[in-house]
Amino acid sequence: MPQEINLPLILIAALLASVSPGPATLAIAGTSMASGKGSGLALASGITAGSFVWSISAVFGLGAIMLANVWMFEVVRYFGAAYLMYLAFKAARSAISQKEIAVKSITGCKSALFTKGLLLHITNPKAILFFSSLYSLGVPAGATIGQLTLVILAVGIHSFFIFHGYAFLFSSKTMTTLYLRLRRWFEGAFAIGFGVASVKILGAKLL
């Protein structure tokens, strides 16, 4: 590993960001408990793809471009906030509903879930700023293409295991049973979580 790259620092920072509660974690948890492992993995794959998109974009300086063109940040910010608010509304409606559901009745198209995960990640403007900051900490200005590729792959593989691990964890029989028993409470918590995330994105600043 090239000594100029502080890969451990990058991966530790990425780990802390991945394990902290956020839109991606909430979405994977809710989908995995309600619809099963397959659906959770499909969603996690979309979120991982989104991580690759932002990671590559950060390498090519999209964060700096956003800083120079505020309107780009604003467009992504409002789209991201609107999408999270939509997810909050769906979760709130499910929490209010007293209709009992079965796990297998919520199965959805895997490609649609992949797209949902991708949109969830690429409409969060904080992600590109996070990756830009992350790379500024551990990647030297004169890094070669090979070094940048190493970082992108390392962070991408790291994200893959974290997000897919969540899908396996929350789709376990214990978690599924718990979800069915406390579905309305879970959905209420998801609604609040997505709502708070939406408000935070609306209040996000470039500097």
Language model region names:
Residues 2-74, 133-150, 154-155:
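Juxtamembrane transmembrane-helix termini in multi-pass membrane transport proteins
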Residues 147-171:
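Hydrophobic alpha-helical transmembrane segments of multi-pass membrane transport proteins
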Residues 15, 19, 52-53, 89, ...:
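Hydrophobic/aromatic residues within the transmembrane alpha-helices of Major Facilitator Superfamily
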Residues 38-113, 199:
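Membrane helix-loop-helix hairpins that form the core translocation module of multi-pass transporters
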